Amino acid sequence: MSESSATPGAAATPPRPAFVPKPPLLAAAYMLASTFIALSQSLGQGFLSANLTTLGGELGATQSETMWLMVVFMAPRAVLPLMLIKIRMQFGLRRFAEVSIIVYVAVALLSLLATDLRSALVVELLSGIAAAPLSTLAFLYMLEPLPPEKKLTIGLPLALTMISLGTPLARAINPLILTDGSWTNILMLKLGMSMICLVLVYRLPLVAAETMKVIKGMDLVSFGLIAASFGGFVACFTTGATYWWVEVPWLGQAIAASIAALVLALVIELHRRTPLLDVRWLTSPAMLHLTAALLIFRIILSEQSSGAPGLFQTLGFAQEQVAPLFWAIAAATLGGGIACALVL
């Protein structure tokens, strides 16, 4: 399983050019571009989550069938960041940014053609693939104008805030956009935002870094196993409550197969000199502490996207009635992110 041709450190990050301060207006433009890219990506997920019931009516599908739209959107976003790191290192930041945003615009155009559940599933799968690099771009654009000592204390909290802001903001503005109840309004908004992102990426290029060949053949094998594993987990945990866990045998079978695929991938990665997934680093005390903190953070945030909306829907509240709550959540999210950037 080991790669004899690899050498330790071959997959190290290529050196970045020395930091050159940008004029204040240009620095602000990069940070605004990051904000817009982050919102474009996160609003897409937020709108999909908020309108699954509406989509079922438009596509002629049941609630359990429309849940698969969320599955195919989230699955590639869960696993693609693993490969995006090496893709970015091998092909360069600028090319990575330009190709990513072109694909995102193309998928936004394609989404206008979805007329039934089958075509919608294909479009949402492509949307998840196209949206995965946008989180990376949002981070890169937020960090680009900041000096090295400010990247983690100011840039990181602000980028995370803008990415997290999309979910509550989508539910807050959703009633304003769906005035006639048509999903096409959402698609046109996403298309317009993607085109603005395209202009921003080409007008504000990222500083090019050195490239190096880091993608190995075994990376594709490991990535395939991890993708199958994460895809199975996403499918089970997203649809489990809808189908109910003990009623359908395939849920347990899919979880078992996902665990087996993940274990096999970890065994392969442990025997590689330049792994796609550095298991030893991920299981270090510092990373385990960070993982636990992020897990708690995500559990708390899940209340915004599934807990509270599900409760209000069960109680019979319309989206217009709960919109003020999500405006408050969005404002609190923004305020918390800014406070974090000022305090750290």
PLM features per residue range, with description:
Residues 56, 60-67, 153, 157, ...:
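Small-residue hotspots at the loop-to-helix junctions and early N-terminal turns
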Residues 54, 82-86, 176, 342:
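Membrane-interface helix termini in secondary transporters
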Residues 85, 89-217:
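Helix-loop-helix hairpins in multi-pass membrane proteins, especially solute transporters
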Residues 1-43, 57:
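Cytosolic juxtamembrane N-terminal segment immediately preceding the first transmembrane helix
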Residues 27-44, 48-52, 63, 107, ...:
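12-transmembrane solute porter fold
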Residues 49-79, 119:
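Extracellular/periplasmic helix-loop-helix junction of adjacent transmembrane segments
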Residues 70-86, 135-140, 327-339:
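Central cavity-lining transmembrane alpha-helices of secondary-active solute carriers
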Residues 163, 175, 179-292:
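Hydrophobic transmembrane-helix bundles of small-molecule transporters
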